[in-house]
Structure formats: structure tokens, C-alpha cells
Amino acid sequence: GLEQPLRDYLYIYRHHKPKIALSEDVVKTLDAWKAEDIRLGLITDGRSVQQRNKIEALGLGRWIENEDVVISEEFGSEKPALANYEYFMKRYPECHDFTYVGDNPRKDFIAPNSLGWMTICIKDDGRNIHKQDFTLTPEQALPKKTIMSLKELI
């Protein structure tokens, strides 16, 4: 029946190599941070194979070491679990200032806010899969700063 073709389609979807690219502004921002010796990490929810394919397609290895990538399926917990964020605090005990940049007020800022991190939300320009509704977001889940573009952080 339908079960086998559905599994086949799911496999294809989860294992395909996406054709995606970073914008020029994002590349410039990441290059600027690398030049300033700013350590970057990535916390993402999802299946490992899909997220790794996206990371590879975007060329993020140029700026982010593999050990600084937390994928929920590999890590064993999803945002907003504290462990996903505390991982970086344990990995870099000499660092005292952490900043988290995200786009989903429902789960991105709760944990880093509770840990005293700077939290920044990139406002949706209409392409985000998560609708941003700050009116329904509890205060502890709100970002400390909102920007329209990553380049504002250079």
C-alpha cells in the first residue's frame, strides 16, 4: 500500500542535498566575526542527516567547528532545553559573554535568557517558517534585542 512509498519519499526528503546558500550579507558578517576571533556555535533542532546536509550546503564549516554544532537528534534534547546552551558554557569556561541569535520566540530565547546570555532575534522578513508572534510570548522568552539583518551586528 501507501506505507512503503511514503517511507521512500520521507527517506528522499530527509537525505536530499539542499540547494541553498547564505546571502552575501551573512557571509560578510561571518567573515567579520572570524576576523575578530569570535567563536561561533550552532544550536539546531531536527534530524541529524537533514541538518548536516544543510550545514554542508551552506558551507558553515568555514566558520563553525564541528564540535560547536549541537543538533537535537544527536544531542538528545531540543530547544529550549538548558543543556543545549550549557554545552557551550562548559566547552568554553574561559568565556563570560555569550550571545544567542535566533528567530523563533517560542523556543529560542527562554534558556539563554535564563543563563544571562545576550539574546537577539532576527525579525521575519516573510521567509521564516515560524511565524513570530511576540504578543503571545511570555516576557522571559522575549529577546533582549531585535534586528532586521545579521549585518547589524558587525
Feature names for model-found ranges:
Residues 2, 15, 19, 77-78:
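Alpha-helix initiation/capping motif
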Residues 27, 31, 43, 47-154:
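Asp-based, Mg2+/Mn2+-dependent phosphohydrolase catalytic module
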Residues 2-11, 64-68:
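Short, basic/glycine-rich phosphate-binding loops at helix/coil junctions
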Residues 7, 11-41:
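Short, acidic loop-to-helix structural element flanking the phosphoryl-transfer center
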